[in-house]
Amino acid sequence: MDASIVSSSTAFPYQDSLNQSIEDEERDVHNSSHELNLIDCIDDTTSIVNESTTSTEQKLFSCNYCQRTFYSSQALGGHQNAHKRERTLAKRGQRMAASASAFGHPYGFSPLPFHGQYNNHRSLGIQAHSISHKLSSYNGFGGHYGQINWSRLPFDQQPAIGKFPSMDNFHHHHHQMMMMAPSVNSRSNNIDSPSNTGRVLEGSPTLEQWHGDKGLLLSTSHHEEQQKLDLSLKL
């Protein structure tokens, strides 16, 4: 039996060589398949990297106003809302500036300086009625007629805006004008006379010294006129 097997194996030696060649071919095919798998794996990794880069490039969002880039649409939306708030504030400031330049200062003048000035007069010992009822005259051409200061109420007692002054104040001013009428007429008559054409007021405020063609003329003092005015007002 064993002798027959040996004889058969020796009788077909070419069959063994054929089997060996087939095994070698199968081994080569298997090795080549492994090499192809490695190449495919490298290609897969490169494709994955390329896809990741393209995905990151697609996720970048840029702002149209300042060209800043953001990685999410939510961040870009908040940034654009901040730009909108800035624009609305800028427009509001421009409208306020335009209205202020067109209509002037909306609050007008403050009454505090006038009130403080009135208090300063009180601190210096000057009374309000002596200021309001004081009668003044100025030097120069036309000063011969005198100038009447209307009596002015203190700042705290002035009527509010939109209210007319009372009739008592109107009668008081009218009475004051009627009492001053004779003195004004007498001064106008003295001016018309040719002897008093070149008079100049000089000296102290209580003594008026007039120079004319006929010599020195002394007029009544300012103090006496003030006393007459006070007496007339008391009546």
Curated annotation (Swiss-Prot):
GO terms for biological process: abscisic acid-activated signaling pathway; negative regulation of abscisic acid-activated signaling pathway; regulation of DNA-templated transcription. InterPro entries: ZFP3-like (IPR044246), Znf_C2H2_sf (IPR036236), Znf_C2H2_type (IPR013087). PROSITE patterns: ZINC_FINGER_C2H2_1, ZINC_FINGER_C2H2_2. Its main location: nucleus. It is found in: Nucleus. Keywords: Abscisic acid signaling pathway, Metal-binding, Nucleus, Zinc, Zinc-finger. Induction: Down-regulated by abscisic acid (ABA). One of its GO terms (cellular component) is nucleus. A zinc finger (C2H2-type) spans 61-83. Residues 186-206 are annotated as: Disordered. One of its GO terms (molecular function) is DNA-binding transcription factor activity. Disruption phenotype: No visible phenotype under normal growth conditions, but mutant seeds are hypersensitivite to inhibition of germination by abscisic acid (ABA). Expressed in the chalaze of seeds, hypocotyls, cotyledons, roots, emerging lateral roots, leaves, sepals and stamens. These data suggest that ZFP3 is expressed in most organs, showing high expression in vascular tissues. Residues 186-198 have a biased composition (Polar residues). Seeds over-expressing ZFP3 are insensitive to inhibition of germination by abscisic acid (ABA). Plants over-expressing ZFP3 are dwarf, have reduced number and size of siliques, which contains few seeds or are empty. Acts as a negative regulator of abscisic acid (ABA) signaling during germination and early seedling development. Involved in the regulation of vegetative development and fertility. Modulates red light signaling in seedling photomorphogenesis. This is Zinc finger protein 3.
